[in-house]
Design a protein with these regions (language model features):
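Active-site and substrate-binding clefts of carbohydrate-active enzymes
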Residues: 65-315
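Catalytic domains of cell-wall/extracellular-matrix polysaccharide-remodeling enzymes
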Residues: 14-63, 126-141
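Surface-exposed charge patches
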Residues: 7, 43, 274
């Protein structure tokens, strides 16, 4: 699936950055989904040539503060860029991002009162998607406030001086230190998607999650039975790569290249992945479209057919 993601990245952005031999320069970093991460996740990423990920400080076990942590894996070290949760979230999900100077005043203590430079991490959909004109906000913030003539004491520094050793805390998420405990009630999570979510919604999310996990276990078991001695994982990954354009454009998926004994099961597995990886578990108001994705996937699985529209959500 990581290989499928790299292939999709090349297709999406029509990457023309090539090395001297004319080959694609593959991405070396990975923005993890909202799902929980553990050491196994990092082992797989490192084995596939990924060198760094973004994590929150709450996800790292370490004796020293740093901006970057080196985490051992089965093959090679992987580096975790530790982002500052409060200020990063204020940019991604806050409403006070129309005035850069006002934003800085509101969060100055988060920026100034620390022994290391703040590290902000925001996915690209933040810019001009969640917040129109966000690129101008960033432009002004960094050029006129964080650096430049107005603040001659602000300087960029080499990150290597900030690297310390650490370990990932299993089953945590960059959106919540409790991972899916936000909806399942595990790990004593009280985050509730940023607050303001009632008990009914929490129960609804938990029920959806448990049902999707049940469907996932069921379809994987049936795939093992249908495959017998055959390997179904690699054919599924290849098919997923083939369908990337259809999925990203909202077109119907094609099962023409899939063995007849796998077609229905591959379709169910794809819908399950969309439901379990959806941002809808974590973000948006109750009326937000993203909240409907897990429920829509459950409905499609119950009908054992694909939705009439595009399969949305997830990573």
């Amino acid at each position: 699936l990581i290989e499928a993601g790299i292939h999709a990245w090349e297709n999406d952005y029509d990457i023309k950055l090539r090395n001297k031999r004319g080959k694609f320069k593959k991405p070396v970093g990975f923005w993890l989904p909202e799902m929980a991460v553990n050491q196994i996740t990092l082992n797989v990423l490192a084995k596939k040539g990924i060198h760094f990920v973004f994590l929150r400080r709450e996800q790292i076990e370490a004796g020293e503060e740093a901006s970057i942590y080196e985490i051992e894996t089965d093959t090679q070290p992987i580096y975790a860029f530790v982002t500052d949760t409060e200020i990063s979230n204020a940019i991604s999900g806050g409403t006070q991002t129309k005035d850069a100077e006002d934003f800085y005043r509101r969060h100055q203590s988060l920026i100034d009162n620390r022994s290391r430079p703040p590290m902000l991490a925001n996915d690209l959909e933040t810019i001009d998607h969640h917040h129109p004109m966000m690129r101008f906000f960033f432009n002004y913030l960094f050029r006129n406030i964080f650096g430049g003539d107005n603040n001659p004491d602000n300087r960029f520094t080499r990150g290597t001086a900030m690297i310390k050793r650490g370990k990932v805390i299993d089953n945590t998420s960059w959106t919540c230190p409790h991972g899916l405990g936000r909806w399942t009630g595990e790990n004593g999570c009280q985050c509730h998607a940023g607050g303001g979510i009632d008990d009914h919604t929490i129960k609804d999310r938990k029920d959806h999650y448990m049902l999707l996990r049940s469907y996932l276990d069921n379809v994987v078991n049936r795939l093992h039975v249908a495959a017998g001695e055959r390997n179904w994982q690699m054919p599924f990954t290849r098919w997923l790569v083939e369908q990337h354009k259809n999925l990203s454009c909202g077109w119907r998926i094609s099962l023409a290249s899939v063995d007849a004994s796998f077609q229905s099961l591959f379709k169910e597995l794809l819908i399950n992945i969309a439901g379990l990886q959806s941002c809808g578990w974590y973000f948006g108001k109750e009326s937000n479209l993203e909240r409907d994705i897990p429920q829509g996937c459950l409905q499609a699985l119950r009908l054992k057919t694909t939705p009439t529209g595009p399969i949305e959500g997830g990573s």
